[in-house]
Amino acid sequence: MDRNIRDVDDVLKLLDGLFAPEADRWTADAAGWWNGFYGDRTKAVPFFVAKPDESLVAYVDRGWVAPGRALDLGCGPGRNSLYLASQGFEVDAVDLSDEAIAWARERTQEAGARIRFHHGDAFELAGSALAGPYDLIYDSGCFHHLPPHRRVSYLALVERLLAPGGQLALTCFASGAMGSELADADFYREPGLHGGLAYTPESLRWIFSDLTEVELRRMRDEPADSPYFGEDFLWTALFRREDTSA
C-alpha cells in the first residue's frame, strides 16, 4: 500500500511521474536527454549561436535592467550569461546538462569572463548553491519546457530568489507560432509535453500576476548576420517585483 503523499512536494513528484521518462525535460533525470541534445555542437539549432537575445540587449540598452546579481536559468552554452557578464553583472548560471555547462565554460574562458556555473536542477539548488537575492532572473526557453504543475515550483523559485525591485525576464513559445496548445489538463490525459507549451499574452500575465509587467511582446526576428539572437515564434517578457519595504 502506497500512502506517501504528505506535502506539496510529494504531490509535485507524483505528477512528475505521470509523464513517461522520455518526456522529462525538467528534472535531474532529464540530464541525459539534454546531454545528447548539446553533444553535437554542429547541429543547426538556432540558440547554439554565440549571440545574446535581442530582447535582453534592449532591456540593458534602455536602462530597464541595470548591472547587479543575475541568475541565468537553463543557461545552455552560456550566450546570455556571457553578455550579462560583459555588461558588469555578477552571474550565476545553471543547467541540467553537463555538456551544456562544459560548452559554456569553454566560451567563458575564451572570453576571459567570470561566471559561476552550476550543474543540476534549479528547483533543487534554489536557496543553497543558488543563493539569492538576484536583481535579475533570466530565462531564455526554460519555462515552456515545464509541465503545468511545475509552474508552482517556478513561481516559488522566483519568490525565493528574486530581490525586491528585481526583475524576471523570459522568452517562451508563442501561441499560434510554436509549441503545444493543449489545455493544461490534457497533458495529464496523454502525458508528454509535445515539444513544449505555447502561451498567450493573457496566460503569461495571469501566471505572473504577482509581478508588474514592464514589457510583453514578440521577439524580433533577427537576420543571420545580426549580432543578436531573435526568433519571432517567441514571446519576450519583462516583469518587475515591486519593493514594498519602503
Go through each PLM region and give its residues:
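Class I (Rossmann-like) S-adenosyl-L-methionine-dependent methyltransferase catalytic domain
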Residues: 1-73, 77-132, 146-161, 167-246
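A conserved beta-strand element that flanks and buttresses the S-adenosyl-L-methionine
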Residues: 138
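Conserved acidic residues
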Residues: 135
